[in-house]
Amino acid sequence: IAKYDDLKQGKSDVNPFVILKCPWCGAQMGVVSRKKGTKEVPGYEKIMGPKRQKKIVFRCRNIANDCAFSKKDYVLPLYVIDESIYDVKPTLLLGTVDKFAMLPFRPEAQGLFGYSNGTKITAPDLIIQDELHLISGPLGSMVGHYETMINELCTLSVHDKQIYPKIIASTATISRAKEQCHALYGCPKEKVFQFPPSGLSAG
């Protein structure tokens, strides 16, 4: 809330709320400079939450009012603050490795993996990893520890059968893909499928 107020009052140029356009219609959101140093932040609203706590929500400010999320009773289902993410448990979650490192220190994060009030519900079943080629060497060794933890938290046990999450990774290079995935995720090499497959060797 304090960072939102700082944005509106022109006290800060740093926008921690990330969202710059409505993902539905493309209308501008975020900081817009005005006269006398003040700033408008269309699309960001400060409201009172159900627990009488102020929170920031995202509502499209489409001038034509033809966006589904510009209506008074609708807000965009986007959450960029950690506390909101832990509370809402969104269907799609974007994160970086440094957030993995915080998991042992945030007990409330267990809800993201299906643990709620001591019971286990369905955990995330699809992990998409971007820039796989960057996770190698010393960084890969460190990330591998957290990936093992994430895989375990996302594994579902049904009738003594382990159902592991599917992992899709994109990379700029496909050399030694099976070896890297085996080292990073602990998956058997025969379970790694490369697309597109290797072509013909020439020369």
Where are these regions (language model features)?
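A substrate-engagement module of RecA-like helicase motors
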Residues: 1-92, 97-101, 108-118, 122
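Conserved catalytic network of the ASCE P-loop NTPase/AAA+ motor domain
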Residues: 84-87, 117-122, 155-163, 185-187
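Structural recognition of the conserved hydrophobic beta-strand(s) that form the central parallel beta-sheet
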Residues: 92-95, 128, 165-171
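SF2 helicase catalytic motif II
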Residues: 98, 102, 111-156
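Conserved nucleotide-binding/hydrolysis micro-motifs of P-loop NTPases
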Residues: 98-101, 133-134, 172-177, 199-202
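Short secondary-structure boundary/capping segments
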Residues: 107-112, 142-146, 182-190
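Short beta-alpha connecting loops at secondary-structure transitions
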Residues: 132, 162-165
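Interdomain hinge/linker at the junction between the two RecA-like core domains of SF2 helicases
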Residues: 177-203
